Amino acid sequence: MKRQIAFLVGFAVLAFIAVVIAPAPAAAQTAPTKPLTIESLYQPGGLGGRGPETVEWSPDGTKLTFVQRDERGEKGELWYADAATGEKKVLVSAAKLAALDPDVNKVKNEREKERLTRYHVAAYLWAPDSKHLIFDSQGQLWLYDLGSETAVQFTSAPDPSGDPKFSPDGGHLAYIRKHNLYVRPVSGKTEKQLTHDTGDSLFNGDIDWVYAEELAVRSNYFWSPDSKEIVFLHMDETNVPVYPITDWMPTHPSVDNEKYPKVGDPNPVVKLGVVDADKGKVRWISLTTDAETYVPRFGWVADGVIWAEVMNRTEDKLDLYFVDAKSGKSRIVLTENTPGAWIDFDHVEARFLKNGKFLWPSWRDGNMHLYLYSFDRSNPMAADAKLETQLTKGDFEVLSIEGADEAAGTVFFSANKDDPRQTHIFSVQLDGSGMKALSSEEGEHFANFSDDGKHYTHMFFGPQNAASISLCAVGGACTPVWQARNEIADYGLRAPKYLEFKADDGTVLYGRLLLPPDGTASGKIPLIINIYGGPAAQMVTKGVPNAFDEILARKGFAIFAVDNRGTPGRDRKFQTAIRHEFGAVELKDQLTALDQLLAQYPQLDGSRVAIWGWSNGGSMTLYAMTHSDRFTAGVAVAPVTDQLNYDTIYTERYMGLLKDDKAGYEQSDVTKSAEKLHGALLLVHGTSDDNVHFQNSIQMIDALIKAGKQFRLMIYPNKTHSISGKDARIHLFTMIEDHFERELK
């Protein structure tokens, strides 16, 4: 149930999220030059124009490459910006790229399209020599020679090949086909199959749904530094239950059975293997006797030594193992415990440096900070890892490690220092000194550093200017790479008022309010609350203006959002306030903030308040409408209605195991409170949602009917969790707007 924003792929998708969902920054009101409508949000390129896709650095750090398509996405070129000069040139022409990297919108299968965009699957990969590229052209791999400007089809099997990886010496390419590992010499034609399992339940180096969605796993195999071996994760999903996803459009509907572990179900059984890339012999590694564990991250410390993170099922303990790849012997070198909380897995990932040290993010002092550990590089198995120093300190959250310049002893990271509603780029020395900001303008800043840490791409969503991407030298100048159209000026997007409230325990809650344009409101103003409310997303950040909020405001509504306890971006105490109890704390904070808002703004009509949200926001909408009488109307899009319907990793992380807290699960089940529904409900779901299953809404429909409650329903055939596509999105947001017009006026 995560909302994920990645820098490397799909800037156009990110820009859409910012325009439609993310909150607005402080900016001066401007007179619009273009009409703002729901249809305009989905014009080719959106409001700001189609941005670069698959932004990558060449391994030698000399080129920043990206795919730039026309507004419709039908034609594109692979460009590069020279790191030294900033000069931009075409690297692969449109005629050649059309076959090598087709537009993702041409993918017909909605679930595959969502996988490619949601999980940011890169369309091309640099070779270590920075002279070749491998393209994944909808399952067939092509090797492109930059010198001769020619492409050779590398795979041609009937089944698709994916997740390609060059060996560090550049001599071989590994890839996944039908859940098995393959390898082939770059200069040869003989393909070797390294693993030989059959069926759809055994994975070797491939990724299942729940690891991809909830542990952000994007690859499950890695080459050894000497290019001789590959470590991979074997996943056995034999005992994982299936969920049927039905395609209703053919005369005879078809069913795809998705492996999906729900709360209390068996998880995939996993183990690490090491395979010889030449001989294909596999050695299995034993890490723990506990079968109820996750192995979400692993890699190579050095030749012959593997690292692996192992987390227990309750997700409050994580062990870092070092493993002798030859003997399979392992030892725990570091343990992270979070009693009374959970492992904040979006951030806790070891990053190994070349000097026998590694970076380790931890919540241990109450905030997410960076710690530097060392080990004996000549004999990594000899002793536990040694804590050298805490690199960052203070009342803020480190959000991500972005890169490192090991020669200069510098680490780069993003954090929300001074304001949890902003994201900035920082650097700090490996001795913990000299922390400084690399960005300063109010807003959201994201970075992608070259391997040597000398240059970075800087993506900026600011309050006064359109979104942009620049190429920057560390400590030097930045050169523009791409600039969005100025949607703020063109469409007259306005900033909200940024507000602060106090929860019952005194905790500061951040909110935002957008009122109708001056002089357009007559009488009391109806209020719409846009909610997410869960552990995966903030609603109140200082990014680009929210266009849908502006559309609603021009219809005479006020739009409000507040980040309750349990949302990210704050300290451990704030985030874990919802542990073992979804709904109650969140709603309490929302209502407390609402009362304070109504007291501050008497022009708002407290008798006409609506609420709406998507995913967890849809769940919270249903919870609010069945556990209070404050809401006149609501829209719940793709909601979880019973936490037992959602996956193990996400739900058990926050709610605990079912056997330990049945009462907590029962109180969060909104189907059990259907008879208490207050207000006019619009319930929305896509039938092919493989994340939050359509089953959730079916159960809610049944409960509401039995309770004698009337409601509106919209089902989107074959649409996934994002309900994507121009036609579906225009229909959906028009229906949401219409629902509020009907019920609040």
Report the location of each language-model feature.
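Positively charged n-region of N-terminal signal peptides that target proteins for export
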Residues: 1-4, 745
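Polar/charged alpha-helical tracts
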Residues: 2-3, 31, 84, 99, ...
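Sequence-pattern detector for short linear motifs
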Residues: 5-6, 53, 712, 732
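Generic alpha-helix initiation/capping and coil-helix boundary signal
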Residues: 5-11, 157, 504, 617, ...
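Beta-propeller folds
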Residues: 7, 11-13, 21-449, 454-456, ...
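Serine-hydrolase catalytic core recognition
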Residues: 241-242, 297-299, 304, 309-311, ...
